[in-house]
């Protein structure tokens, strides 16, 4: 879980003892190609960090499958709104290849605030960072061709 620890410490300045306590809340899981991590319509109970592999966030609209997001190594993935509110997921999240993740349940995630006293501030900063990445991807989608987006993302 060293890679999760390094990633977490990039965003959250905490002592090693607190960081180790937070990291211990995550479970390492292996997903096979095509395996669903979160299914649209289910209560969203987990958030994951992608250690290795590629995951796809998608939905079906009018019979057409739509990809909303692709997460690769080093990204966190969930239906954030459903995870935070305890609601039903709007998305299906599927492993596109054999994938390794570190997963944390909603109940364990809520324990982080007891470990890191200023977690609400740190969490807000992290969500802002994630939102900025999303805004940049939307801009790329609007301003680049499909080929340019592919080359930018996978190179």
Where are each of the predicted segments found?
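Cyclic nucleotide-binding regulatory domains
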Residues: 35-97
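Conserved hydrophobic/aromatic beta-strand scaffold that supports enzyme active sites
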Residues: 28, 70, 101-103
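Conserved short-loop catalytic and cofactor-binding motifs
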Residues: 6, 41, 138
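Polybasic "coupling" helices that flank or enter modular domains
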Residues: 94-97, 102-155
């Amino acid at each position: 879980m060293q890679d999760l620890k390094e990633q977490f410490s990039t965003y959250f300045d905490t002592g090693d003892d607190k960081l180790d306590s937070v990291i211990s809340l995550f479970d390492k899981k292996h997903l096979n190609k095509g395996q669903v991590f979160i299914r649209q319509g289910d209560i969203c109970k987990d958030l994951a960090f992608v250690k290795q592999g590629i995951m796809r966030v998608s939905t079906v609209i009018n019979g057409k499958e739509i990809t909303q997001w692709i997460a690769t190594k080093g990204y966190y993935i969930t239906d954030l709104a459903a995870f935070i509110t305890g609601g039903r997921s709007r998305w299906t999240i599927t492993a596109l290849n054999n994938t390794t993740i570190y997963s944390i349940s909603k109940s364990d995630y809520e324990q982080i605030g007891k470990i890191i006293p200023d977690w609400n501030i740190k969490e807000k900063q992290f969500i802002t960072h994630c939102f900025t990445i999303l805004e940049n991807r939307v801009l790329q989608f609007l301003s680049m061709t499909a080929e340019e987006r592919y080359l930018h993302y996978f190179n």
